[in-house]
């Protein structure tokens, strides 16, 4: 009985480790999509190469240790319209899977504080959004 419990605990811990490891094919697909959907124009992913439009728009950078970190966002006053209307209301969010997907699907719903709203909704499938998520998440490097 003890052996069975230990085996179940070991299997569970191995599954957790595997879940944290990114799928390399999905990351590669996300990288291609990041380029073909021109995300790189606004979102910097290389510390040595600034994103041209991103500097002016103060767009989110995907460099360094950013995943799982908190950020302030301003809420849209009228989420039913496709145009961002500043509400003056701010909320703290964590850059995680849920917030990333929401930002890609509804970019005007919550805009990072001090950023200029301008990201158009991307015509993407659910699978493409998962690939973009995997790529962006893979870029976050914890500080040593």
Please provide the spans of the model-predicted regions.
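Sec-dependent signal peptide recognition
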Residues: 2-8
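Hydrophobic h-region of N-terminal signal peptides that target proteins for export
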Residues: 8-18
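Electrostatic cytochrome c docking/interface patches
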Residues: 16-35, 50, 93-94
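Short sequence/structural segments immediately N-terminal
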Residues: 27, 33-36, 112-115, 140
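Gly/Gly-Pro-rich "capping" loops immediately C-terminal to redox-active cysteine motifs
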Residues: 31, 44-103, 118-124
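Short pre-active-site segment immediately N-terminal to redox-active cysteine/selenocysteine motifs
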Residues: 35-38, 46
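Short, cysteine/histidine-rich loop/knuckle motifs that typically chelate Zn2+
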Residues: 41
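C-terminal capping alpha-helices of c-type cytochrome domains
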Residues: 98-105, 109-110, 117-144
């Amino acid at each position: 009985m003890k052996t069975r419990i230990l085996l179940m605990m070991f299997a569970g811990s191995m599954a957790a480790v595997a879940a944290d490891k990114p799928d390399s094919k999905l990351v590669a697909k996300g990288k291609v999509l990041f380029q073909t959907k021109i995300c790189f124009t606004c979102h910097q992913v290389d510390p040595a190469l600034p994103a041209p439009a991103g500097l002016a728009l103060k767009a989110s950078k995907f460099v360094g240790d950013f995943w799982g970190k908190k950020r302030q966002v301003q809420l849209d006053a009228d989420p039913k319209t496709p145009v961002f209307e500043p509400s003056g209301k701010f909320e703290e969010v964590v850059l995680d899977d849920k917030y990333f997907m929401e930002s890609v699907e509804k970019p005007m719903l919550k805009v990072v504080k001090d950023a200029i709203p301008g990201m158009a909704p991307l015509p993407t499938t659910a699978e493409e959004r998962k690939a973009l998520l995997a790529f962006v998440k893979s870029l976050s490097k914890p500080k040593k």
